[in-house]
Every structure is written in C-alpha cells, then in structure tokens.
Amino acid sequence: MAIKLTSYYRGSHVPELPGVDTFHSTALFHIFEGTPGCNPLLLTISENGTVLAKILVVVQRIARFIPFYNIRRCVSYGTGEYFCPDDQREPLFNEMLKEITNYARRLNCFVIEVRNLPSPLSGFASFRRNSYFPVNWLRVRNTFTGDEKGIEQSLSQSRKRQIKNAIKNGAEMGTAQTEAEIKAFSLMLKRNYLSKIRKHFPAIEFFEQIQRGIKDVHIGDSWQRFKIFIVKYQERIIGGSVCIYSGDTAYLWFSGGMNKTHLRQYPSVMAVWQALTDANNRGCKYLEFMDVGTPFRKHGYRDFVLRFGGEQISTRRWFKFKWKWLNRLCLLLYS
C-alpha cells in the first residue's frame, strides 16, 4: 500500500477533510492555533488522494520552573480518526505516532501524552513499538436515557437539594454570548480552578476562539461541537463550564465556580448540572468528565462529579518522556 503522510501546521493550509470526531477536527485545530502557547499539528494519511486516517495533536506550554525555559508537552486526545478497514488502522497509527514523536522532539517537549482512548487496548502494539508506557487512569461517565427525570433520579439527595436551593436563591443559568462574558468567565475560572483538576489552564484566547468558532460558518458546524455555559447571580458570572461534543458523547472539559463567596448559589454544582441537562436534550448518550485522576489516590473533583450519578470506568493513558533514562525507568515500572 503506497501511502502519503502529510503534516499541516497552519489552519489556512488544511483542506476539507472527512470525519466527525471533534478532537481531530479542523475546528479544534483553529482554536488551538489561535491560543498563545499552543502549537497544533494535524496529520493525514492518504492513498491516491483518498484520506485514510487523520490525527490532531497540540504542543502546550505548561509550566516554567526555570527562568527563560518553557516546559512543553505534546497531547493527543485519542488515537485519531480512520476511514479504512479495521485491519489497516494499526499500521497507519504506527506511522502517525512516529511522526508525532519526531515532531515533539523537534519542539523540545518534555513529555508526550495520548489520552481519551476509545478502548484500553487501542494502539497497544504501536505504543509498545515506539517505547511509550501506560498509566492506569479513570474516567467518569453519565449515561442518558433521553428522559430528564432519569437524570434527576441518578443524582444524590444532597445534589438534588443543592440544585433546588441554588435556583431558589437566585442562581441563573445560560450560555456565554458576548466577548465581555467570555472574558469574565475565563478570569473567574482561572482564579477558582484547582490544580488537582487540571495542571494546564489555557490562555483566555482559548475561550475566545471557541466563541468565535461557534459563530464562524467558515469552520463548519463548530456551533454543534462546543458550548460555554455560565452561572450568574445578580448579573455577575459566578460559575461555568465548557463542553465539547463528539459523536454521541459530550465531554466536560472545564468547570468551576466561586463556591467560597457564593455558598447558597452552588455555582460549581449548577455549572455541571447545566452541562448534563444540555447533553441530554441534545440526544447525547453520554457525558464524560475529563481529568478525574488516577485510581492510585483520592481525587476531590472525581468525588464531586460522582455525586451526579456517573460511573467510574477504567482506562489508560500513554506517555513518553524526552529523557531516555526517565522513560526507561517508567517502562520498567509500568510494564
């Protein structure tokens, strides 16, 4: 099979591509491209002009421990999207994974992370072949039946009481519509976001790009793929969440609220509740909470979201470190 591997570094160079996976879409490429500290790469494999596979990765600047030196990581949300028979997927993914590894090395990334696997065994042989190591992880997922009463029945009694009291005490739910609301939302979330939930928090431009993408017809049906929810009290944004929609699943990417100063409005609870009801109304089968931690230790955010009636599912993430000695050590520890 004579195949062609193509790399796209700029959104203006990306042609129209097939596929419905938002995590490997041109729309998400544009969002990353417009966010400071992010360098996206979109890979495609084609044969005789027909696209067989594609994958989107992004290099993020995550921390600065040493002055004038940036720590970078390369992240892929899944193993890509394929338009070929199942028996061709593994060799195609192996070719893309080799290119991703080389790209991360050129950009001096400290670690490569592949997460959101469709199944724990996805890409197993290719990861092993390219010296990646697995770490057991957890995911929390709510399942919908299409009935809003079913969502309420799955809640804990304390959650039902909190939602009822929040509405009674003046909490209002909606979606971000203006640039001022986007800015207020992102600043609120950054101030109140726990490092235990997610170590990387994007620049404000990330949320601005999402909002522009929702309104921009030039990047396809992105209005169906992203949504920013906000919780208000007396016209002030006190909470909110960001959802990304792909296939039959809604993914809660970010959520948070000003819980200490607005105890009676339960902003974090309302931010999640709004995402759940919207996903159900859209006809999604699942809502998955991203970044709920590993099974090795307690995780406050995981305990928080489990009270919305979701179930824990075992999965794994694959990593590769820049330092060979550290990567070899992890291969021994996690193999």
List the predicted regions and their residue ranges.
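Conserved acyl-donor/pantetheine-binding loop and adjacent beta-alpha core of acyl/acetyltransferases
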Residues: 58-79
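Short, flexible active-site-proximal loops enriched in glycine and acidic residues
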Residues: 66-69, 107-110, 133-135
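Active-site/acyl-donor-binding loops of N-acyltransferases
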Residues: 9, 56-63, 125-150, 281-335
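A conserved beta-strand-loop-helix scaffold within acyl/acetyltransferase catalytic domains
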Residues: 2-48, 52-65, 116-261
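A gly/proline- and charged-residue-enriched helix-loop-helix capping module
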Residues: 73-117, 122
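Aromatic (often tryptophan-rich) hydrophobic motifs at membrane interfaces
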Residues: 83-87, 91-102, 208-324
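Short catalytic-loop micro-motif centered on adjacent basic/acidic residues
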Residues: 111-114, 174, 287-290
